[in-house]
Amino acid sequence: MIVLDASAAVELLGDTQAGKKIAARLSTERVLHAPHLLDLEVASAFRSHSALGAVDAERIAQALALHRKLPIMRHPHYPYLDRIWALRHNFTAYDACYLALAEALGATLLTRDKALASARLQRGNVEVI
């Protein structure tokens, strides 16, 4: 079971070299999991790419269309607020949201964020790709 974070999703949707590795890693997964936060973080990342002129609007529209088609089961973050708060000393609330979900599901959090590799989950693990 995989929880996909925004850093991995943006690479996947952007069809980058890292995105190709992520696609290969996800090839056997029928359903991915993510907090509802994922959609906002993906949109925010693409907004930044657009503002920098790194990616044109048409390509971003294609990536967002693909994002909507990914088999992602979205989870509310409200049930995990206590755990998110408990992780506050080492992680932002945004990062802790993905960690708390992976922990609750006993899943692997797939990320590009090396800082998350230090997380010690009670159940599940973190895979930096």
Where are these regions (language model features)?
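Acidic, PIN/NYN-like endoribonuclease modules and their adjacent C-terminal/linker elements
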Residues: 1, 99-129
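Short, well-structured N-terminal submotif of metal-dependent ribonuclease cores
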Residues: 1-38, 49-61, 114
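Active-site-proximal, substrate-binding regions of enzyme catalytic domains
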Residues: 43-72, 83
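Active-site neighborhoods of divalent-metal-dependent phosphate/nucleic-acid chemistry enzymes
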Residues: 70-112
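Histidine- and aromatic-rich ligand-binding microenvironments
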Residues: 4-5, 32-36, 90-93, 113, ...
